[in-house]
């Protein structure tokens, strides 16, 4: 059903390309995962161009659990251990310990403080000692191999950033309805229309990446 509802937005390839262009322009994208999985839509921004206004939107329009998607090597470089030793969450979402910038924040909760924490973490020269633990930003470790390994929003986010030629770090939060329920695809499409954001799916990213591999082959 997801693919048929998204047909007006073009093919899977066209939807991904629209998303990549939006990210390059510093704008947000909406990514829906598989219907037999979480069946949720996440609002995603590139971490390197994230603004306070965008963070405020993530806090206001979404679940409030703002996550920073990072590749495995960055998680290791920052020495961020898993949030729990034995991950028993339904889809194995790889939360690390939460973080806060040690410098430049007050309580760490405001949009500006969360942006400062994210920019501190993704800096090329970032060190483990730059971050306090716990904090109000929740890093997620992406599986190597991206959506071809795990069809999650974490991997989809990192894949999109890399395909767009951006730093491999993205910020996401699940879109919610005004009554607090989770937004499904029809609501996600309406949200995208209201805020002029492209909508795509994890399946679209899988198709896009496989097409690139086929062309290389």
Swiss-Prot record:
D-ribulose 5-phosphate binds at residues 37-38, 42, 150-154, 174. Signal peptide: none annotated. Mg(2+) 2 binds at residues 38, 153. One of its GO terms (molecular function) is manganese ion binding. Its cofactor is Mg(2+); Mn(2+). Coiled coil: none annotated. The keyword Lyase applies. Homodimer. Catalyzes the conversion of D-ribulose 5-phosphate to formate and 3,4-dihydroxy-2-butanone 4-phosphate. This is 3,4-dihydroxy-2-butanone 4-phosphate synthase. The lineage of its organism: Bacteria, Pseudomonadati, Pseudomonadota, Gammaproteobacteria, Alteromonadales.
């Amino acid at each position: 059903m997801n693919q048929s509802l998204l047909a007006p937005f073009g093919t899977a390839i066209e939807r991904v390309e629209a998303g990549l262009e939006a990210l390059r322009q510093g704008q947000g994208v909406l990514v829906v995962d598989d219907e037999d999985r979480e069946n949720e839509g996440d609002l995603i921004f590139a971490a390197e161009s994230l603004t306070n206004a965008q963070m405020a939107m993530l806090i206001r329009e979404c679940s409030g659990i703002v996550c920073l998607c990072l590749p495995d090597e960055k998680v290791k470089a920052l020495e961020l251990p898993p949030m729990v030793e034995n991950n028993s969450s339904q889809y194995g979402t790889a939360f690390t310990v939460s973080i806060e910038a040690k410098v430049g924040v007050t309580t760490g909760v405001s949009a500006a403080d969360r942006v400062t924490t994210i920019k501190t973490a993704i800096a090329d020269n970032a060190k483990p000692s730059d971050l306090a633990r716990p904090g109000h930003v929740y890093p997620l470790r992406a599986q190597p191999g991206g959506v071809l390994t795990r069809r999650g929003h974490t991997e989809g986010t990192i894949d999109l950033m890399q395909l767009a030629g951006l730093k491999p770090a993205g910020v996401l939060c699940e879109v919610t309805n005004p009554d607090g329920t989770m937004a499904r695809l029809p609501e996600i499409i309406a949200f995208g229309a209201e805020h002029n954001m492209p909508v795509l799916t994890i399946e679209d990213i899988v198709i896009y990446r496989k097409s690139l591999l086929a062309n290389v082959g």
